């Protein structure tokens, strides 16, 4: 079968190759991947900066954001049936008793990222216990479930932390970034009735800006406009340290900033002491969030349906490019105006 692979640690080793077909063991399912989303983590792996092949393999099959059809069942599987549409979660625990999304580094494997093959292949396998069923009517947008699950966990942490301390949900939110995660965060917050301001570097006539405004949010062009005001909740979805700091500065007293990005190492920031003192005196909270649990995937599917029905098909407009498997290389190169690029493995 064909699969999109890399040699972890070797830059620009991306290729489409023939690999052996996997066979499901007890408790596993054989999947027929249909659509696979591409994200910044894939780019890091392709550049040789991250990723680990499964034990005994010299290559890693990419693809951790997937919509698939169940092709065959391993022994003992009874929670799904052949032909079901499903989304597999990403992470699998290794000797970790915590919820899988809270397992520390070294205590988990991740499909298409770390120690487990992904789903950018004509067939893949995963554990049946980590599958979420997808309604047929969400087939065209369910590939957004995994990135949205990350948002769901982050928003849950932010909103529940705010409510636990101040007794009511946040009314205003600042979303830093208008890529897939930023726009999905804006979508979820809009569905929750929170007033949104989103900041990114694209101009006001860009698709990203128009999508924020379509949600009823205010868009700030960070290149030409100054961000002002205070916000109850900040969702940082860029991975830029300077914006994470700006988010902390813009928190209202008692506010919560949720960090969803992965940041490059930097030196000490100017004015850091004053910023931290302000955080103490105003009871500000900063929380990091990574990965997601099954309930976040389930909530993501519910929000995709709600947004599709009530926001005039908004989720579909986040998918800006669909690339067939034969032209796989095009899926891993995107422009500033692309939002979610998807690899169509098969129809």
UniProtKB/Swiss-Prot annotation:
Pfam families the record matches: ADH_N (PF08240), Glu_dehyd_C (PF16912)
GO terms assigned for molecular function: D-glucose binding; glucose 1-dehydrogenase (NAD+) activity; glucose 1-dehydrogenase (NADP+) activity; glucose 1-dehydrogenase [NAD(P)+] activity; NAD+ binding; NADP+ binding; protein homodimerization activity; xylose binding
Coiled-coil zones: none
Keyword terms of this UniProt record: Carbohydrate metabolism, Metal-binding, NAD, NADP, Nucleotide-binding, Oxidoreductase, Zinc
Thermoactivity: Highly thermostable with a half-life of inactivation of 10 minutes at 103 degrees Celsius.
Residues holding NADP(+): 178-181, 260-262, 289-291
Residues at which Zn(2+) binds: 39, 64-65, 146
InterPro entries per UniProt: ADH-like_N, Glc_1-DH_arc, Glu_dehyd_C, GroES-like_sf, NAD(P)-bd_dom_sf
A Gene Ontology biological process term: non-phosphorylated glucose catabolic process
EC number per UniProt: 1.1.1.47
Keyword Ribosomal protein set for record: no
Gene3D superfamilies: Medium-chain alcohol dehydrogenases, catalytic domain, NAD(P)-binding Rossmann-like Domain
Sites where the protein binds substrate: 41, 110, 146, 291
Reactions listed under catalytic activity: D-glucose + NAD(+) = D-glucono-1,5-lactone + NADH + H(+); D-glucose + NADP(+) = D-glucono-1,5-lactone + NADPH + H(+)
Similarity remark: Belongs to the zinc-containing alcohol dehydrogenase family. Glucose 1-dehydrogenase subfamily.
Free-text function comment from the UniProt entry: Catalyzes the NAD(P)(+)-dependent oxidation of D-glucose to D-gluconate via gluconolactone. To a lesser extent, is also active with xylose as substrate, but mannose, arabinose, galactose, fructose 6-phosphate, glucose 6-phosphate, glycerinaldehyde 3-phosphate, ribose, sorbitol, ethanol, erythritol, or lactose are not oxidized by the enzyme. Can utilize both NAD(+) and NADP(+) as electron acceptor, with a marked preference for NADP(+). Is involved in the degradation of glucose through a non-phosphorylative variant of the Entner-Doudoroff pathway.
Name used for this protein in its record: Glucose 1-dehydrogenase
Organism: Thermoproteus tenax (strain ATCC 35583 / DSM 2078 / JCM 9277 / NBRC 100435 / Kra 1)
